[in-house]
């Protein structure tokens, strides 16, 4: 995963002028009423259609373009399909908001033109901004017949903060109810206080992106800039936790794979 490298390259690039401008990802075409030549076949961007199903902060899609049927090799169709998505939606939108992708050779009955599908992505961008007041998503899962409460800060992808390449897992043991959830309000308040203290310690050198609570443990997922002293500051905060075992484990994870299972 080279998103961090691309961001550093972009930040070091010269300012844009009348001729040249730099970008760290492929931007969408300004005009979809154009054709591209792919493997000797002319492909009309505007003929791309999408059948979509929105989840919480992701959209699963089936993508169709008549040009797919010009190729017998499915791997060529897949490469062309991803190119069309980058050309029509932009690489940023594809990576942040698209979940499962299927490239199909027949136009689905309820598919919409790609130009209309962009409205769905605009809605997601507004609902889950990358700066300012950000919106947490909450879900519940069952593990060994015990509930796990999950909170995530979409989008859980590298492009949300590409310079934060180190995953830090912080696990707290707490007084648990028989369900595995925090026993009482006092325990909840203690967990909230240590979360706030960690957020203050991390400051602008990282962020908490997901929290899992259940089975007597709260697991917080941070992504941080390891070139700072942020991990040392976090350890100083954790030394104050006196309600159970606590564990901090950093790992280099530029692709944010450690939280990929929490995208929903």
Positions of predicted regions on the chain:
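Short beta-strand->loop micro-motif that forms the acidic, two-metal-ion catalytic signature
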Residues: 218-222
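Charge-rich, low-complexity segments
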Residues: 2-195, 203-209, 214, 225-232, ...
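A common structural junction motif
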Residues: 238-247
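Glycan-association/targeting regions that enable binding to alpha-glucans and other polysaccharides
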Residues: 254
């Amino acid at each position: 995963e080279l998103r961090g490298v691309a961001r550093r390259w972009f930040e070091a690039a010269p300012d844009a002028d009348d001729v040249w401008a730099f970008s760290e990802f492929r931007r969408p075409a300004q005009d979809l009423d154009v054709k591209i030549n792919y493997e000797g076949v002319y492909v009309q961007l505007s003929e791309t259609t999408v059948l979509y199903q929105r989840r919480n902060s992701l959209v699963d899609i089936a993508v169709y373009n008549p040009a797919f049927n010009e190729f017998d090799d499915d791997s060529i169709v897949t490469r062309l399909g991803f190119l069309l998505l980058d050309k029509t939606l932009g690489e940023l939108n594809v990576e942040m908001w698209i979940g499962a992708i299927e490239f199909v050779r027949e136009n689905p009955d309820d598919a919409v033109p790609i130009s209309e599908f962009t409205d769905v992505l605009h809605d997601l961008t507004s609902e889950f901004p990358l700066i300012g007041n950000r919106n947490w998503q909450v879900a519940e899962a069952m593990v060994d017949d015990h509930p796990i409460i999950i909170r995530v800060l979409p989008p859980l992808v590298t492009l949300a903060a590409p310079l934060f390449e180190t995953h830090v897992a912080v696990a707290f043991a707490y007084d648990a109810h028989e369900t595995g959830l925090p026993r009482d309000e006092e325990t909840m308040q203690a967990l909230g206080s240590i979360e706030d203290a960690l957020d203050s310690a991390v400051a602008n050198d990282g962020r908490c992106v997901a929290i899992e609570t259940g089975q007597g443990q709260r697991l917080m997922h941070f992504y941080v800039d390891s070139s700072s002293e942020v991990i040392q500051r976090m350890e100083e905060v954790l030394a104050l936790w006196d309600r159970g075992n606590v564990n901090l484990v950093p790992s280099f994870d530029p692709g944010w794979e450690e939280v990929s299972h929490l995208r929903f």
